[in-house]
């Protein structure tokens, strides 16, 4: 059997004024024998005065954790880690996000801070319509490349995910000492089910004669 694991095509457009970016558009599709799926379709507006604040609108990756936003071109393996695949099987969603990150790195400590706050549908990449009125709030705060020595740098971040979905059936699943169990409760229909995640990640990078080596760690805890 022959098949295509990935066949992605991306186009983007950047409009600049006074040699600085102002507007950015991106469209990415994944076309395989199973069909064509839009993976990215968003616009980014960048403030022209301070060049620190930008607004994302459309379909794009959720700003939670390190590996969720690490593109396939930057990963050492074709797939993301198992933990990330379970919690975020479709790492993209429709929404709007406000981002703070200085485009003019003048060496100040605050130029290395990146803050993202987004509001998303929560229904994921492949859902054609919103399933409920709940929205997911996702935040991420990063400090990029703190110099520990001329060759050693440290990056760290914390993420938060506050969301919910609507239950459409009577089944309730719970983990107990004996394992996973389920019960039928009529009150569960239409009930709000919380999704709350909290995460932290760290990356230690060492430059050497052959390039650079990096150690990464990520921890996520929450309720699903």
Regions found by a protein language model. Name each.
Residues 118-128, 176-185:
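Active-site-proximal beta-alpha loop/turn segments in soluble metabolic enzymes
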Residues 151-224:
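Detector for outer-membrane/organellar transmembrane beta-barrel domains
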Residues 1-125, 131-138, 142-149, 160-162:
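Outer membrane beta-barrel
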């Amino acid at each position: 059997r022959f098949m295509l694991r990935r066949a992605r095509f991306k186009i983007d457009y950047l409009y600049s004024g006074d040699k600085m970016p102002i507007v950015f558009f991106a469209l990415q599709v994944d076309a395989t024998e199973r069909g064509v799926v839009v993976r990215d379709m968003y616009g980014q507006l960048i403030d022209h005065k301070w060049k620190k604040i930008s607004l994302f609108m459309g379909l794009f990756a959720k700003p939670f954790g390190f590996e969720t936003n690490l593109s396939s071109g930057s990963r050492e393996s074709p797939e993301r880690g198992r933990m990330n695949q379970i919690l975020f099987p479709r790492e993209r969603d429709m929404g709007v996000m406000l981002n703070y990150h200085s485009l003019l790195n003048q060496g100040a400590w605050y130029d290395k801070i990146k803050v993202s706050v987004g509001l998303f549908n929560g229904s994921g990449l492949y859902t054609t319509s919103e399933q409920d009125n709940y929205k997911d709030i996702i935040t991420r705060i990063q400090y990029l490349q703190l110099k520990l020595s001329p060759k050693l740098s440290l990056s760290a971040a914390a993420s938060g995910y506050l969301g919910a979905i609507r239950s459409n059936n009577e089944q309730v699943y719970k983990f107990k000492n004996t394992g996973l169990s389920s019960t039928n409760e009529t009150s569960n229909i239409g009930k709000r089910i919380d999704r709350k995640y909290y995460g932290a990640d760290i990356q230690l990078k060492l430059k050497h004669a052959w390039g650079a080596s990096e150690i990464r760690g990520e921890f996520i805890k929450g309720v699903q």
